């Protein structure tokens, strides 16, 4: 029973799928994908459930969402293990993901009232009221790198706003998706309000092409996001929120505090084995002796990072990538850059063939032409050297993406200049690129998104505004517009 449709667990009628641990190859989950008819059935269930769910008082929807938060807390250890085993990330990091899921509940409730909710302004002869209404039936596409937290960032605000949903997890993390949905079931969601369909690209296309869908909330790669944008083109009535990738620059202008700068770079580039959309992909280091020393220290410390299994003791900083194929893709990207003329500073290495364990790689590309402007989703850091700060900003903006950007410097004026000139949705100063505040919007421009940031702003794309002018009585204005004559004519 791998699908949850209209409150029932049913067997998928599509292809057989098996999920294994990307390091040990242990079988974790087996089941069948949905087929197109079951995807349509899930949408119909959501459509039928929508009117009653949307009419529920906000307090009733909030109570169910808060029950879900309590269940997350009660089952934190179990969900942590599921995420860690399925993604290959260490237990410590999977635990932080579940904590982020729990914290998302209170934040989303606050954001609903701050960003949407209801506001009233008194007028002389009545009131002006702003309300927000749910879109209807929305699809949620989840990624594999944070298979609990990132879909949660769409699902929670969408449910609070009164929408009903069809959730398709990544085909690489079906176990996490199913586990989370079982907690929603226990929280008491009415039948049809949230539905689960499993599957890969074909099921995603079947879901996104449904005529009865009111919108789609997506987190994933730019290539898939662009495909969804093309698929929904000519349908302005549908809400589309795209949270995509990045080719993010980190500028090292002043590395006087050498180890702190190296630590920030490791956190920016290699955490989650480089599988965060905000990870630094491009490291811009100022020319000179200090920059040389910084790179030498970075290579030294990064070379000691040994990826390990999810349950190793002591815990590793990074675990495996999502699959052995993903690790192979990073190796191929590194070799491609070497072939273009790049100088390897630290060669990535497969810890064991057939697994997804991969050590970090660092390659210098200063002066190399035709380097692909792409997101290599793994622990590969590209280095460019620059002569002056204006050149650093030019290099930073030399990408079609625009998600995150960072600066290591003690000069506030340089940060102010970067804030004015950077083309990115997240711009950090002496903080890792992978750090983001839940009380701020999360998203980017260019190929990183379609101006629908999530996190604190997720409430914005989960409801539409309704403006009203209201008066309990109908009265004739004391002063009429020119040309209007309401005088009583005497009967002749």
Swiss-Prot record:
GO terms for molecular function: succinylglutamate-semialdehyde dehydrogenase activity. The keyword Oxidoreductase applies. Pathway: Amino-acid degradation; L-arginine degradation via AST pathway; L-glutamate and succinate from L-arginine: step 4/5. Keywords: Arginine metabolism, NAD, Oxidoreductase. The keyword Lipoprotein does not apply. The active site is at residues 243, 277. One of its GO terms (biological process) is arginine catabolic process to succinate. It catalyses: N-succinyl-L-glutamate 5-semialdehyde + NAD(+) + H2O = N-succinyl-L-glutamate + NADH + 2 H(+). NAD(+) binds at residues 220-225. It comes from the Bacteria. CDD domains: ALDH_SGSD_AstD (cd07095). Its EC number is 1.2.1.71. Belongs to the aldehyde dehydrogenase family. AstD subfamily. Catalyzes the NAD-dependent reduction of succinylglutamate semialdehyde into succinylglutamate. This is N-succinylglutamate 5-semialdehyde dehydrogenase. It comes from Salmonella agona (strain SL483).
